[in-house]
């Protein structure tokens, strides 16, 4: 047996036929195939994400590994800035404000902010991500802490709130 075969990390479970057949299994990071597809985010993976969701995989399945305590596929897609995957997950009912467990308690918005991914941040806010001025992780750090240039995100949210409140009309029905 070659040393390369022994040293091959368990992360290559996707290429193993038995792992592909059992979509509920996890790799050494605690990730399912849905997590892997969301993290990679390319077109091929988007089709895999759709297939897994069509087969009944929970869109909010959490990863339980040493570095991914409670991360959902949406956390990983936001971290990578994969807008099409994020859109698919949200359409299927992903919790846009899901928090990781452990010390941080990050939302997908925190993940996108840490990566300074402006498109992902804008997409999450426009999709309804919770963005009060005091949104903090468990260390009391707001997304601004991880991305100092995020002030524009609060401005987008403020403009959205203003346009929503100004377009509020009351409907009356006449009998």
Each language-model region and where it sits:
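Ankyrin-repeat junction/capping positions
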Residues: 24, 60, 64, 97-99, ...
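Intrinsically disordered, low-complexity regulatory segments in ankyrin-centric signaling systems
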Residues: 1-55, 64, 161-175
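Leucine-rich solenoid repeat scaffolds
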Residues: 125, 131-160
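Ankyrin repeat domain, specifically the short helix-to-loop turn at the C-terminus of the second helix
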Residues: 17-20, 50-58, 87-95, 122-130, ...
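Conserved ankyrin/ankyrin-like repeat signature
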Residues: 45-48, 84-85, 119-120, 152-155
């Amino acid at each position: 047996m070659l040393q390369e075969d022994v040293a091959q990390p368990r992360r290559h479970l996707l290429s193993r036929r038995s792992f592909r057949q059992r979509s509920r299994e996890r790799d050494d990071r605690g990730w399912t195939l849905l997590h892997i597809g969301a993290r990679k985010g390319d077109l091929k993976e988007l089709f895999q994400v759709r297939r897994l969701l069509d087969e009944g995989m929970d869109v909010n399945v959490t990863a339980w590994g040493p570095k991914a305590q409670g991360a959902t596929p949406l956390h990983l897609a936001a971290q990578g800035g994969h807008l099409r995957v994020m859109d698919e997950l949200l359409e299927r009912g992903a919790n846009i404000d899901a928090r990781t467990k452990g010390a941080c308690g990050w939302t997908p918005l925190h993940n996108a902010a840490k990566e300074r991914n402006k498109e992902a941040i804008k997409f999450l806010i426009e999709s309804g991500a919770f963005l009060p001025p005091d949104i903090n992780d468990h260390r009391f750090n707001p997304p601004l802490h991880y991305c100092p240039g995020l002030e524009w995100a609060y401005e987008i949210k403020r403009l959205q709130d203003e346009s929503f409140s100004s377009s509020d009309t009351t409907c009356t029905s006449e009998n």
